[in-house]
């Protein structure tokens, strides 16, 4: 793998519903206390991050990495300045993971939207099927 420290998990499907990020993180940390976790979200999610359940506790548990989007959103100043929130310098994409999931569920082709290696991984591991 290109990123050996990244791991895909279906943990959110196995936890009771409704499930919130703070609950997923608490579960992961309790199961793997020796692992350092980070959270990666799209910039579009950072705009409303302060409305997430226990968002301050999320930031106590993990560093937050924010992937940029083509369309700049209005991010609250206190979040931009937070020491645990890291804005990534990466190619700006005009779609979100939710867009990819919707297309996959409809059986639409997404190969032009994501790297070939990512598509191969999704297919090999039956992710989103």
Regions found by a protein language model. Give the residues of each.
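Nucleotidyltransferase catalytic core that binds NTPs
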Residues: 1-129
